A protein has these predicted regions:
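P-loop NTP-binding catalytic core
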Residues: 244-360
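N-terminal accessory targeting/assembly segments
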Residues: 8-295
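Switch/coupling sub-region of P-loop NTPases
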Residues: 380-499, 508-510
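NTP-binding/hydrolysis catalytic cores, primarily Walker-type P-loop NTPases
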Residues: 519-602
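Walker A (P-loop) ATP-phosphate-binding motif of ABC ATPase nucleotide-binding domains
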Residues: 363
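Hydrophobic anchor at the beta1->P-loop junction of P-loop NTPases
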Residues: 366
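Conserved lysine of the Walker
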Residues: 374
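The conserved Walker
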Residues: 369-370
Length: 602
């Protein structure tokens, strides 16, 4: 019994020693209480509350003069308006709010040279994240190149070159690329630079578009998010007990950021929104300019424009498998010149031909797949239209913005709205003294019918864009659209109408490296109708032969008679433009009729 008690005492003593040792082991040094104060999340919360306090302050309770009262009311109204419009792509409002944030950080949050490095470790590059380094690089590039900062960063460091991946060639910027570029740059940070970078980080999480906020402002072709990676529903459905490490290593949809740059779609794999909720916040805010309606489960997509003229498309589940947005910008070329767009050897040939087609008032389609530069080329060739002509444009969403490029010309653009159909807009255009009609994009059956109407009765001539791959596909696609709308019931007659209206097809394409060029310029030649052969024989075998010939001609016309032919005038071969055909005599005569005497001599 005594031995048992002794053993229990020794066991308790041993346990006490072990417990005492563990409690007195050297613990890691606790974080300073102030460390949380300098986190971006804490600063964001403080800034949000500071703005709320400013807007909710009761000025009537303050003992101030009437002049000071009016001044504060004006400033508060200006702040409230800027907070609302900065999310629409309004650069002035964005800069105003960002400056306000800087003021709050310095005067209220007491950020100074001594503590600013605790927010972002400017003094210790090893502690910087890849996002920190990218934003620092972009900030310094912006100081030199303005809104062409991202363009300069990509070109100077060859980030738009194709790279080999497991499945083939792709365009991708990795974290290693950013680390390498950052090591090559020796940046000297003043306090103002550090404060600007931090203010931008806070702004983009508060009212901006997250990590793409500054990217969206750059002079690029576009930016999109949520278009790659594993959708959130996959993580809900997968059995996490099997291969949980594999699932966690896969990129999510909120890790997806792509930029469209000079015809190339480049994956910025080092950037991420950080969470599904942040991607959803950006999607919900980026399309709201001019109140286009609510994005909801029942209305799962929205197409709109932003304050700066960018086109934005937003989709959400259940219509799409994940939340995603697409911003397409049209300011990468400030004033599009044809000579800047068509750059290959022999470019004088297509440029001269396009010039005379437009001056000659030919109905012309600019075709090609997405991202080949159709809209940009259309904007550029407008300059060949006589300044004496008035232009009327019909679009689904404002994209061309021709008055920004040609402010001295008589130009007015209409678009379809929930209450005004495109057909009503077209009917109204006939009463607006328009000479030339331009359709931004012929993508649906009703728009095809508009185009045919405009080209036949509403204007001197028409220019439009289309996604057709070949000239034959262009004519047949428009024919099918006319049949779909019910404007025609006979396939041959509908095709004849299209072939009679459209004169030329300028087809654009791009190669795997993103190089854009005109693949061909093609003339559409309607096949002229010829009367049926007359029966001249009086009888016998000759009459039978003539009858069979006439019968054969009838059945050919009723079944497989060609309505039109195509003739390539200019083609692109091996990096060079070549003239391979001549315009028909009828088109040459029609062009000459619309030219001035000086232009005919030229």
């Amino acid at each position: 019994m005594n031995e048992f008690i002794l053993a229990m005492i020794l066991l308790c003593l041993f346990g006490f020693c072990v417990l005492y040792y563990r409690m007195n082991r050297i613990q890691p040094e606790p974080a300073e209480p102030d460390d949380d104060r300098y986190s971006i999340a804490a600063i964001l919360l403080f800034v949000r509350e500071a703005f709320n306090d400013i807007l909710k302050t009761n000025l009537y309770e303050m003992n101030i003069t009437r002049e000071e009262f009016d001044k504060r009311v004006h400033n508060r109204n200006q702040l409230r308006k800027a907070l609302k419009t900065c999310t629409y792509g309004d650069m002035n409002a964005k800069n105003y709010i960002r400056d306000f944030i800087k003021d709050i950080l310095v005067k209220r949050y007491n950020i100074n040279e001594g503590n600013i490095h605790r927010i972002i470790s400017f003094d210790n590059p090893d502690k910087l994240t890849v996002q920190d380094k990218f934003e620092i690089l972009l900030y310094h590039s912006k100081k030199l190149h303005g809104y062409r900062a991202l363009e300069a960063l990509i070109i100077e460091n060859h980030l738009d070159r194709p790279v080999m991946v497991a499945d083939g060639v792709s365009f991708k910027v990795t974290a290693d690329d950013i680390e390498r570029i950052f090591l090559q740059k020796q940046h000297l940070y003043c306090f103002e630079d550090k404060l600007n970078i931090i203010a931008q980080r806070v702004y983009q999480l508060y009212k901006g578009y997250g990590v793409i906020d500054e990217i969206r402002d750059m002079r690029i072709d576009g930016v999109s998010g949520g278009v790659s990676g594993i959708p959130s529903t996959f993580h809900e459905e997968v059995d996490l007990s099997v291969g949980i490490s594999i699932v966690s290593s896969l990129p999510s949809s909120y890790d997806s950021i792509w930029v469209f740059f000079k015809g190339k779609t480049i994956h910025l794999s080092f950037l991420s929104f950080g969470s599904e909720s942040e991607l959803i916040r950006v999607c919900k805010n980026i399309y709201r300019y001019n109140y286009p309606g609510q994005l909801s489960e029942s209305n799962g997509y929205k197409v709109n424009e932003m304050k700066d003229g960018s086109r934005v498309v937003v989709v959400r589940p259940p219509f799409a498998e994940s939340w995603a947005f697409f911003v397409r910008k049209f300011d990468s070329i400030e004033k599009a010149e044809v000579q800047e767009l068509i750059i290959d050897k022999g470019k004088e040939i297509p440029i001269e031909l396009i010039k005379w087609l437009v001056k000659g008032c030919r109905v012309t389609a600019v075709t090609g797949s997405q991202g080949t530069g159709k809209t940009t080329l259309l904007m550029a060739i407008i300059k060949y239209i006589s300044p004496a002509f008035t232009l009327r444009i019909q679009e689904l969403a404002f994209e061309l913005h021709l008055r920004k490029i040609y402010p001295e010309r008589n130009i007015l653009t209409f678009r379809e709205t929930p209450t005004i159909s495109g057909q009503e807009g077209l009917d109204l255009q006939k009463k607006t003294d328009g000479t030339v009609n331009i359709l931004g994009e012929v993508a649906t059956a009703p728009v095809s019918a508009w185009m045919l109407q405009m080209a036949q009765v509403a204007s001197l001539f028409t220019l439009f864009t289309h996604h057709a791959k070949t000239t034959e596909n262009l004519v047949k696609a428009l024919r099918n659209n006319l049949l779909q709308t019910g404007a025609f019931s006979n396939e041959k007659i509908a095709e004849q109408q299209v072939a009679d209206v459209i004169n030329f097809d300028i087809h654009l394409t791009k190669d795997i490296t993103g190089h854009r060029y005109i693949e061909r310029i093609t003339e559409i030649l309607p096949v002229e109708s010829v009367g049926y052969p007359n029966l001249t024989a009086s009888g016998g075998e000759a009459l039978n032969t003539e009858f069979l010939t006439a019968a054969r001609e009838f059945f050919v016309r009723m079944t497989d008679r060609k309505i039109f032919e195509t003739r390539d005038i200019v083609v692109w071969e091996n990096g060079c433009y070549k003239g391979v055909g001549r315009l028909s005599e009828g088109q040459i005569a029609s062009i000459e009729q619309t030219l001035t005497s000086d232009e005919r001599e030229e």
